[in-house]
From Swiss-Prot:
Record key words, sorted: ATP-binding, Nucleotide-binding, Nucleotidyltransferase, Transferase
Reaction(s) this enzyme catalyzes, per UniProt: sulfate + ATP + H(+) = adenosine 5'-phosphosulfate + diphosphate
Organism in which the protein naturally occurs: Chlorobaculum tepidum (strain ATCC 49652 / DSM 12025 / NBRC 103806 / TLS) (Chlorobium tepidum)
The keyword Transferase is assigned to this record: yes
InterPro entries, per the entry: ATP-Sase_PUA-like_dom, PUA-like_sf, Rossmann-like_a/b/a_fold, SO4_adenylyltransferase_pro, Sulfurylase_cat_dom, Sulphate_adenylyltransferase
Gene name, Swiss-Prot/TrEMBL: sat
Name of the featured protein: Sulfate adenylyltransferase
Superkingdom assignment: Bacteria
């Protein structure tokens, strides 16, 4: 059996990253263009366009695609797309840019020239409307809402040429991979069914259990961690990488998992982001996405299994990548094993509920971590990391993190 097709009607990867002489000449041309500064989120989105992770998109969305994506998860041409991919700027700068003009795209933090775009459309949006549709809230305390409300007032749309993958290939050498690279690895391993495990946390025992369930039913699992920006208090990607490496080395059969990373910032859009996670994992070659409790959520904005239910609400055939829906998992003292609500008949008092938030809070506050929460080799790495922190971040517990 072959791997799943890339997303879109043409079913072929569309990486927009330039190479060779074309890259040299286009970068030279871009030096004389007006510069549009990119936020961290926009830079990550541009890199995903570059490597084909956002196939079949050819650039940042125009108004019709923005509206369709926001309101019905469907672009103007009928392509399924659950979260808008947009680029914004100030009204003052937008007024200086003509339709049809090419602009240089520069990462605001590093100053690196990342690409160029031919501006085909300029439009304003109702940001609060986007937030209510995508995040199901316009509460400014929601980190994804804050991100959208703080962006520029005018969206610029058009096809892009991508010049760079930023620091990801060097900073995360051996982990950061493109869809072409993961597909090649899957084929070399003889895998046709591959489950993706989305993570922004070091893997505790519950995560390990989810991945092992997937290993039982698929040829392999891509442990696919986010390498872009998170919220304060989250654990950095290099620490997560080391934790996952030691876990897979000590507790998984060799050749059943691959660890990789992708360049996006977290949006914290809960169910909608779960759909986006499945969509781009299709481009990376994954037939399934593991969807556990409160996937891509934050705080108490979403129900623990809203991300399960949303896959039942999308049109049939919208995605080739299917969800592996797994119930609430925990360690049960009476079962003396990891279990789920489907497999364990015992009382809540007999269970140790595991969550990344809970683990971060215990480590941050120097508390003793219960024996069955995480593997000792993983805890050793995390304790070293927390011991080296000079500034502590207050980690708030939400209901899903404490088993409510």
């Amino acid at each position: 059996m072959a791997l799943v097709n890339p997303h879109g009607k043409e079913k072929v990867l569309k990486p927009l990253l330039l190479t060779g002489d074309e890259l040299v000449s286009e970068k030279e041309r871009a030096k004389s263009m007006k510069q549009v500064r990119l936020s961290s989120r926009e830079t990550g989105d541009l890199i995903m366009l570059g490597i084909g992770g956002f196939t079949p998109l050819t650039g940042f969305m125009g108004h019709a695609d923005w509206k369709g994506s926001v309101e019905t998860c469907t672009m103007a041409d009928g392509t399924f797309w659950p979260i808008p991919i947009t680029l914004s700027t100030s009204k003052e700068q937008a007024d200086t840019i003509a339709i049809g003009e090419e602009v240089a795209l520069v990462d605001d933090e590093s100053g690196e020239l990342m690409g160029s775009m031919k501006v085909e459309e300029k439009y304003c949006i109702d940001k609060a409307h986007e937030c209510r549709e995508v995040f199901k809230t316009d509460d400014p305390a929601h980190p994804g809402v804050l991100m959208v409300m703080n962006q520029g007032d005018v969206n610029l749309a058009g096809p892009v040429k991508v010049f760079s993958e930023g620091s990801f290939p060097t900073e995360f050498a051996g982990i950061y991979m493109t869809p072409a690279q993961t597909r090649k690895m899957f084929e070399e391993n003889g895998w046709s069914t591959v489950a993706a495990f989305q993570t922004r946390n070091p893997m505790h025992r519950s995560h390990e259990y989810l991945v092992k369930i997937a290993v039982e039913i698929c040829d392999g699992v891509l442990i696919h961690q986010l390498l872009g920006k998170l919220k304060p208090g989250d654990i950095p990607a290099d620490v997560r990488r080391d934790c996952i490496n030691v876990l897979t080395e000590k507790y998984f059969v060799k050749g059943t998992t691959i660890q990789a990373g992708y360049p996006l910032d977290m949006r914290y859009a809960g169910p909608r982001e779960a759909l986006l996670h499945a969509l781009f994992r299709q481009n990376f070659g994954c037939s399934h996405l593991i969807v556990g409790r409160d996937h891509a959520g934050v705080g108490d904005y979403y129900g623990p299994f809203d991300a399960h239910h949303i896959f039942d609400q999308i049109p049939e055939g919208a995605l080739e990548t299917k969800p592996l829906k797994i119930d609430w998992t925990f360690y049960c003292y009476k079962c003396d094993a990891m279990a789920s609500m489907k497999t364990c008949p015992h009382e809540p008092a007999d269970r140790l509920n595991l969550s990344g938030t809970k683990l971060r809070k215990m480590l941050s506050e120097g508390e003793e971590v219960p024996e069955h929460f995480s593997r000792p080799e993983v805890l050793e790495i995390l304790r070293r990391y927390y011991a080296g922190l000079t500034e502590k971040v207050d980690i708030k517990m939400h209901s899903h993190a404490i088993g409510k």
